[in-house]
Structures are given as C-alpha cells and as structure tokens.
Amino acid sequence: MKEKNKKLVIIGAGEFAEIAYEYFSGFSDYEVVAFTVEKAFINKSELFGLPIVPFEEIEKDYPPDKYKTFVAITYTQLNRVRERLYKQAKKKGYKFVTFIHPTVFLGRDVKIGENCFIFEYNNIQRKVKIGNNVIIWAKNHIGHQSIIKDNCYLASGVIISGYCKIGENSFLGVNCSLNDKIKISKDTIIGNGAIVIKDIEEPGGVYVGNPARRLPKSSYEVFGVKEEGI
C-alpha cells in the first residue's frame, strides 16, 4: 500500500463514493479524510468511520488550499448531478484528483482531464483525449486518436474504435461498440450491446440494437432533465 501523503475529500456518500474510497485507499497516495453531500441528502453522520459533512459548508473544515476533492457521482440525471457538483466545487476553489488504476494501459500522448476515474484493465491508445469529469469503468478499449468529451460515462466492455468522438454528457452502456471514425452528439445514450455503425448527429437520442436504432423517447425524457443542461 502506498504511503498516504495527500488529503482528499470525496463528494458523495453513495455506492460509487464507497467504491472510490476503496480504490483511493488501495491504489493511490491520497488519504480520504471525509465525505461531503448536500445537506438535504445527509442521512448519517459517518461512512467508514469518516465524517460526512454538508457540501454547502465544506470549506470551513476542509479548505481548498489544503484538501483536494473527487466528485463520486455516477450518471444520475444524464451526468448532470456530477457536472453540477464539479462546477460548484470548482467555484469554491477546489482542485480535483483523477484516479487511474495501475493496470490501465496508456498509449503515447494520451491526455486526461481532471476529476476522471478510470477503472482497471482499460486500454487507452495513443493520442486519445479524455475531457474533465469522465467515468470509465473496467475493461474498455478506446481506440487511437479518439476523443471523449466532458462529463461522459462509460460502462464496462465498451469498444470505441479509432478516430471516434463522443459528445458531452453521453452514456455508453455495457458491451456497446462503435465503428471507427464515428461521431456521437452530446447527451446520447448507447444501450447495452448496441453496435453503432454511423454518426449520431442529433443530440439527446437513445440507441439500441445491431445496428443501433433510435428509440422514440429522448435521453432528456428518460432522465427527466432539460435539454439545455444545468
């Protein structure tokens, strides 16, 4: 286990926050010292023996000049909750930690933004660009020179071929695949096992099947959010 010489506050106290705590504790030099959630959602005082403090007051006990943070929220409301808390914490002056599991393969000239979480056994090829606030679960392939924009969420087993572009706040489900040079517009949901063989130009679509076809409901209807975002 690595020596813990940096302090981290996790934003969130749900299942993903618990998972993030395990990974940071086991595979990083960050010591998790507290969890924080918005006052309205606090239903207990501790998690793993650590305090859960109101997000609205986090800087009182954990000032941004001494502590970094990570927003451990999944794809709730089409990734908008994670995006909102990320922006609010940034406005408070916090800097963010990106976690990359030691088993991840990173090709040359890969660029990864802040507040990202990349689980084990991902293959990220040369010149891939990953934006801020992106969650990538285990065992995905991201092909050379592909771009994943801010606030996206990739489940496990996703295959993204080379030169693809994934728009902001999109969700890619388990075992979906994209042909090379595919462009996906923002706020898109790609369902489990879907095979995308052509560009998705209109934002807010939900796609399933092989080849992927659009469903009548939009992603905004599925998640109950507005198209313009936060």
Regions found by a protein language model. Name each.
Residues 76-84, 88-146, 157-160, 164, ...:
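Left-handed beta-helix
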Residues 2-68:
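A solvent-exposed beta-alpha-beta segment
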Residues 5, 32, 64-66, 93, ...:
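A general structural motif
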Residues 16, 74-78, 213:
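Short glycine-rich anion-binding loops that position phosphate/pyrophosphate groups of nucleotides
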Residues 41-101, 105:
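Phosphate-bearing ligand-interacting subdomains
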Residues 18, 22, 80-83, 198, ...:
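Alpha-helical elements of the RecA-like P-loop NTPase motor core of helicases
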Residues 150, 155-230:
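Glycine-rich hexapeptide-repeat left-handed beta-helix
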